C-alpha cells in the first residue's frame, strides 16, 4: 500500500508541475503494478531500464549523423574550438562519474531514495530533465556560457 501512496504522490507532483515525462513514467509503473505477472518484470526493468534509456537517447543523438546533418567536417571542427574540447572533456567526466555512481548505488541502495527525491524536485520544480547523458551537454553549456565561448 505504501508504494501506491508514494507513486500517487509522485503522480500528483508531476501533474502539478506539468511534467509529461514523469506523468507517463509514473503511469507506466502504476499500470505494471496492476498486472499480476508483471511483478516479475519490475526487477528486470529496474536493473536494465537506465541502459535502455541511454540507448534510446544515443539513438536520438545519432539521428543527425544518419540524416547527414552532422558529418566528418563537424567532427574535425570540434577539435578546433575550446567549446568542442570542453564538450569532449565533459562527456568523459560524466562517463567516469557515472561509473562511480553505479558502483555507489549497488553498495548503498539507500542513496536511491535521495536520488529519486532530488530528481523529482529537479524535474518538477526546476523544469530539469531526468537524463544522464544530457548532463554532459548541460555541463558544457555552463562552461561555454561562463567563458563566453562558441563552437
UniProtKB/Swiss-Prot annotation:
Membrane topology per record: Multi-pass membrane protein
Name of the protein: UPF0756 membrane protein lhv_0995
Pfam families: DUF441
Alphabetical list of HAMAP family matching this protein: UPF0756
Subcellular location(s) of the protein: Cell membrane
Family assignment from sequence similarity: Belongs to the UPF0756 family.
Disulfide bonds: none
Superkingdom per UniProt: Bacteria
Annotated TM spans: 4-24, 25-45, 52-72, 78-98, 115-135
Keywords linked to the UniProt accession: Cell membrane, Membrane, Transmembrane, Transmembrane helix
One Gene Ontology CC term in the entry: plasma membrane
InterPro entries on file: UPF0756_TM (IPR007382)
